[in-house]
Design a protein with these regions (language model features):
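Acidic, glycine/proline-rich low-complexity segments that act as flexible tails and inter-domain linkers
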Residues: 1-52, 105-122
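Alpha-helical scaffold segments that form or flank carboxylate-/histidine-based iron centers
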Residues: 53-61, 90-95
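Short, thiol/selenol-centered motifs that function as redox-active sites or metal-ligating centers
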Residues: 56, 60-72
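Iron-sulfur (Fe-S) cluster-binding segments and ferredoxin-like electron-carrier domains
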Residues: 73-84, 113
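C-terminal structural segments of small proteins and small subunits
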Residues: 88-112
Length: 122
């Protein structure tokens, strides 16, 4: 997905992803349900907090250049109470690891997500 084609908004991208998951689940529920159970278990509170797990997931999303997951986990970080500074610091760690690709996503997509998601709380 190109940065300029964000379905007109970050929330639009999240909605598009949820629609896709719904369609996928309808077609092959046994795989979707197993995958969803696995990911839910991974993000439960444990030795790491849910908040720490979201920050890690955001960093991985940036390093792998996965824009849907970057948006999803930026929202997850906000939902878990992370500050902008904490989010950007985690992004900085990802940039140190992954280099320029992560930094370019941080200075554009993540900052846009922070602005839009915080201004459109449900």
């Amino acid at each position: 997905m190109e940065h300029e084609q964000h379905h007109s908004s970050v929330n639009g991208v999240l909605h598009h992803y949820k629609e896709g998951i719904g369609s996928f689940t309808n077609q092959i529920p046994e795989i979707a349900e197993t995958y969803n159970a696995f990911t839910q278990a991974c993000f439960q509170e444990g030795s790491l907090t849910k908040r720490e797990k979201q920050l890690i997931a955001l960093g991985i999303s940036l390093a792998t250049q996965d824009e849907y997951c970057t948006i999803y986990h930026t929202k997850g970080c906000l939902d878990q109470g992370c500050s902008d500074k904490e989010i950007l610091e985690a992004c900085g760690v990802s940039a140190a690891f992954a280099g320029g690709a992560a930094m370019s996503q941080t200075v554009t997509l993540v900052q846009e997500c922070l602005t839009e998601l915080k201004n459109h709380k449900h």
